[in-house]
A protein has these predicted regions:
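FAD-binding beta-loop-beta segment adjacent to the flavin cofactor pocket
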Residues: 238-267
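SAM cofactor-binding core of SAM-dependent methyltransferases
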Residues: 4-55
Length: 297
């Protein structure tokens, strides 16, 4: 199998393929971030780097040999957490570059499979992307999958693909305490980590805005069971400010949230590790989707 990965990052797609027993004959990676690319080369030295996706028409690629193309196109323009400018933003324009490349591959090899990924977004954006993807590429199956089914992180993502037979992953029952190096947490699933996680967070934004997962020392947080008027069990958060300490998730813990092997991103600064992990795929979700490829069955 020959694979073309757009916006490859630290090559979560190769990790996913490896986990389902697929070793590509050729793996082309389009990525401009030098730190993410260095992690890819450290772990997968046979990767063929292509550089920036906007230079795709200069690439030395035999398009007819590409069997799979994967693209997690930039989310900042489409995300509910961003400016929501869609393709009016320069990064949003990369959606059209993505479609152009996939269309070019399918013209050269109609049997090629594709997988596109982006954040859960407002309905109008999702419908816009789905419509234009269908217009450009033909039959498209759309799936909304939460990484919480395979990891300890709430991370809802849309996937558009021509791979058939995809169902929701089975819930592995992984909770946040399972992946911590130390400390305790007040919830079962982490907030979605993003590329800005390295900036840290504070208690106010964590509890009021549900942002940037924090971990507490054992004597810093206690749970008090409570029941609402409907009899549903809920949790009150009680903080002992005097004795409380809190911290960010470690890079290792973020690797585990993304179902990346421990230590995979070692070799760059923690800032860069957080950034690439926040930008990356949840590996086990991609592995679940790609396990439906005919070459794998």
């Amino acid at each position: 199998m020959n694979v073309l990965s757009l916006f490859d990052g630290m090559s979560c797609t190769q990790l996913a393929l490896k986990s389902i027993g697929v070793r590509p004959n050729k793996y082309y990676a389009a990525e401009w971030d030098k730190y993410a690319s260095s992690i890819t080369q450290k772990n997968f030295p046979d990767t063929i780097p292509l550089g920036d996706v906007t230079d795709w028409f200069h690439w030395d690629v035999d398009w007819s040999t590409i069997d799979l193309i994967v693209a997690g196109f930039p989310c900042q323009s489409w995300s509910m957490a961003g400016a929501r400018l869609g393709d009016r933003d320069a990064r949003g324009q990369l959606f059209w570059v993505t479609l152009d490349i996939i269309q070019h591959v399918l013209e050269a090899n109609p049997n090629a499979k594709f997988l596109m990924e982006n954040v859960k977004m407002k309905a109008a954006f999702e419908q816009y992307i789905t419509h234009h993807t269908q217009e450009a590429l033909g039959v498209v199956n759309k799936h909304l999958i939460n990484s919480a089914l395979v990891s300890a992180q709430n991370r809802q993502r849309y996937y558009w693909t021509n791979i058939e037979g995809i169902e929701q992953p089975k819930d592995k029952g992984v909770v946040l305490k399972d992946i911590l190096e130390n400390g305790v947490t007040d919830r079962e699933k982490a907030h979605c980590i993003d590329a800005n996680y390295f900036k840290g967070g504070n208690l106010k934004s964590y509890f009021e805005k549900h942002r940037r997962q924090l971990v507490f020392s054992p004597n810093g947080l206690c749970h008090v069971g409570d029941a609402d008027l409907n009899g549903n069990q809920s949790i009150k958060r009680v903080l002992d400010v005097k004795d409380m300490t809190w911290r960010k998730l470690t890079p290792l813990e973020c690797e585990r949230l993304q179902t990346v092997p421990d230590g995979y991103t070692e070799g760059v600064s923690n800032t860069q590790r957080y950034k690439m992990l926040g930008n990356g795929f949840t590996v086990d979700v991609i592995a679940h989707i790609l396990s439906n490829l005919e070459q794998v069955k």
